[in-house]
């Protein structure tokens, strides 16, 4: 999803299609070290956007914790090492807001990293993403001066939009709710069940806004990026700047879809962290702002869902 949005943004900036190299998971398994090394040796890219990841909601993280930590660690390590071995000087790693402690002060600043206990429901994924940040920082520290390595990290909040995964069990909250309300609408269901209490607050960012943020951070002069980060805390948050309750999200999506069923909250299911809202002032001060508001973004996401039925 994010990779496709980055491609759209680069094309809109005037980058030639022939200068953009992409691979689907079917074409290149990033957990296969030899295959990744071969790809970099053949293609010789000059910049890398590392957007690939195994992602999912609370259910998927609970059921497949080993997959989430192993696959993400392997993908990150293989790509970053292969990039270095093949002379790539500029790389941007995309992480996640779940890197921050469960009870971090809100909004979460970049310096909250590693200051407390992680949210248990997605700890393996979070640890993998923290490792990705530290991989970038470690390569910069060891090879920055000698090889010109400049590997950066950006931490998106919860993303949604075209190209999302709408699987009924393994998707994130917005695509899961879009599917659930759409199916309830078709079935004229009197009610729709939502996991948890509906009270947790979350921040959401439209994927094309994230693509713009990613390209913006990648293109910053090194001196500017270094001025706003430190060698041991080099990541930058990317969020919309506001958060909403899950109940509000459900109500807005129901209205977008046109589902009249009663929303019922299953309080026997986990909520996850009580609040996740990121402080994106560092990125805002560097010249980026989110553009797409939730209601507009949900409408675009629902249109994308309908287009893939």
Show which residues each predicted segment covers:
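NAD(P)H-binding glycine-rich loop region in Rossmannoid oxidoreductase-like domains
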Residues: 33-73, 85
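C-terminal substrate-binding subdomain of Rossmann-fold SDR/epimerase-dehydratase oxidoreductases
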Residues: 7-9, 13-14, 183-309
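SDR active-site strand-loop-helix element
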Residues: 23, 48-54, 91-97, 154-156
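N-terminal Rossmann-fold NAD(P) dinucleotide-binding loop
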Residues: 3-4
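Conserved Rossmann-fold NAD(P)-dependent oxidoreductase catalytic core, especially the SDR/UDP-sugar
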Residues: 77-122, 152
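Active-site helix of classical SDR
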Residues: 124, 128-131
């Amino acid at each position: 999803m994010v990779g496709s949005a980055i491609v759209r943004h680069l094309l809109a900036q005037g980058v030639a299609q022939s200068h953009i190299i992409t691979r689907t998971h079917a074409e290149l398994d990033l957990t296969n070290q030899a295959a990744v090394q071969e790809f970099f040796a053949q293609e010789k890219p000059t910049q890398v956007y590392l957007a690939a990841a195994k992602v999912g909601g609370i259910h998927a993280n609970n059921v497949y914790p080993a997959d989430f930590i192993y696959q993400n660690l392997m993908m990150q390590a293989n790509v970053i090492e292969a990039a270095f071995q093949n002379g790539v000087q500029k790389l941007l790693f995309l992480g996640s807001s779940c890197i921050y402690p469960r009870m971090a002060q809100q909004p979460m600043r970049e310096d909250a990293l590693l200051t407390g206990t992680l949210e248990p429901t997605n700890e393996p994924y979070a640890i993998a993403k923290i490792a990705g940040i530290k991989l970038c920082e470690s390569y910069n520290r060891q090879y920055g001066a000698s090889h010109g390595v400049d590997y950066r990290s950006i931490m998106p909040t919860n993303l949604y939009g075209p190209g999302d995964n709408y699987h009924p069990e393994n998707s994130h909250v917005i695509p899961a709710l879009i599917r659930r309300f759409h199916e309830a609408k078709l079935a004229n269901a009197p009610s729709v069940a939502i996991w948890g209490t509906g009270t947790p607050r979350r921040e959401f960012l439209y994927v094309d806004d994230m693509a713009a943020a990613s390209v913006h951070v990648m293109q910053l002069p090194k001196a500017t990026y270094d001025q706003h980060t430190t060698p041991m805390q080099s990541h930058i948050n990317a969020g919309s700047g506001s958060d909403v309750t899950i109940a509000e999200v459900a109500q807005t999506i129901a209205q977008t879809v046109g589902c009249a069923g009663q929303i019922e909250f299953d309080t026997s299911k986990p909520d996850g962290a009580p609040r996740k809202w990121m402080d994106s002032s560092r990125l805002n001060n560097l010249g980026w702002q989110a553009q797409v508001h939730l209601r507009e973004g949900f409408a675009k996401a629902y249109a994308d869902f309908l287009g893939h039925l």
